[in-house]
Amino acid sequence: MIIRKFSSKDLDAVEEIEREAFKTPYPTSLILGFWSMYPNCFYVAEIDGRVVGYILGSMDWGNGHIISLAVKKECRGLGIGTALLKTLENYYFNIANCNYIVLEVRVSNVLARRFYYRMGYRDRKLLPKYYEDGEDAILMIKKKPNAKGPLIITLW
């Protein structure tokens, strides 16, 4: 498995994974918009030259923000999501010097929530009716080891 930065040639594969993974996939314009603003926060996982997963992030008020993480169904359970998340965490904590990483996850997405708990994320706040279909989200955070200073969240 190879983890590398996203490039425009990966767009079709990322969109396919996004559609497979989420009830309401992000539109192409949003994916490309985040990439243009945060090119260091978008990675793909490749196996045998095929994109099988991706992670997309941004940075807000000095925090890392995970926008989307998905792996092709037939490739789940192989450590791809973990490798992608660790890659983006490394960028946020060690290069961008963020003290916190935040993300939102559907209350009903128990598998994703368990994954993030295993990776050191904790529930911070319930976000009522966050998604277009009215489902609540949970705001989760991970603090950089030995980080000092408050968590500043403006979106929520």
Curated annotation (Swiss-Prot):
Keywords: Acyltransferase, Cytoplasm, Transferase. The keyword Electron transport does not apply. The keyword Mitochondrion does not apply. Pfam families: Acetyltransf_1. Coiled coil: none annotated. SUPFAM superfamilies: Acyl-CoA N-acyltransferases (Nat). GO terms for cellular component: NatA complex. One of its GO terms (molecular function) is protein-N-terminal amino-acid acetyltransferase activity. It is an enzyme of class 2 (transferase). Residues 1-145 form the N-acetyltransferase domain. Its EC number is 2.3.1.-. PANTHER family: N-TERMINAL ACETYLTRANSFERASE, N-TERMINAL AMINO-ACID N(ALPHA)-ACETYLTRANSFERASE NATA. Belongs to the acetyltransferase family. This is Uncharacterized N-acetyltransferase MJ1530. It comes from Methanocaldococcus jannaschii (strain ATCC 43067 / DSM 2661 / JAL-1 / JCM 10045 / NBRC 100440).
